[in-house]
């Protein structure tokens, strides 16, 4: 029997695998800060991450990603600042380059039942389970 927290942790793991798949196809993930990047890496994310705070404002960020021409997956936080940034960036990206239409952000909210507001909290929420999941997956492949 899987407990609710373990179920969410498993969904988060699948979410990370999905992001990895998108990035192998050329997408880039955008997060707000360095802690968000660290949390994704802790959970096994291997693709390219753009940290919004490393840019000097929305215009510089959008200019950079639009020149790049790659699909952008916005995973900014769900707090007031993150929602405002997401809205402004989304409006500008709509005109300039491909993006995920906030699919992954909506999926993030749905899978966590709205309990996790910041990407950086993902690793705190499910890291112990994710480590067990990875160990289990590795052991089961070794048996086959």
What is each of the regions a protein language model found here?
Residues 1-26, 34, 38, 60-61:
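Phosphate-handling DNA/RNA-contact segment within nucleic-acid enzymes
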Residues 26-27, 76:
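A general structural-boundary detector
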Residues 15-19, 31, 37, 53, ...:
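Aromatic-enriched hydrophobic runs in primary sequence
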Residues 7-10, 28-30, 51-54, 80:
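A short linear-motif detector with a strong N-terminal bias
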Residues 27-49:
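Short, contiguous, helix-prone interaction/anchoring segments in small proteins
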Residues 2, 42-43, 48, 54, ...:
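TOPRIM fold recognition
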């Amino acid at each position: 029997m899987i407990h609710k927290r373990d179920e969410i942790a498993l969904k988060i793991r699948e979410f990370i695998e999905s992001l990895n798949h998108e990035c192998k196809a050329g997408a880039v993930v955008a997060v707000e800060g360095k802690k968000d990047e660290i949390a994704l890496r802790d959970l096994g994310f291997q693709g390219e991450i753009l940290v919004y705070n490393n840019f000097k404002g929305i215009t510089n960020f959008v200019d950079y990603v639009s020149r790049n021409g790659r699909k952008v997956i916005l995973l900014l936080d769900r707090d007031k600042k993150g929602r405002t940034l997401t809205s402004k960036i989304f409006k500008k990206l709509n005109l300039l380059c491909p993006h995920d239409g906030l699919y992954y952000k909506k999926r993030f909210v749905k899978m966590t039942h709205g309990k996790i507001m910041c990407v950086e909290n993902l690793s705190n929420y499910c890291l112990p389970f994710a480590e067990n999941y990875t160990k289990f997956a590795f052991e089961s492949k070794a048996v086959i």
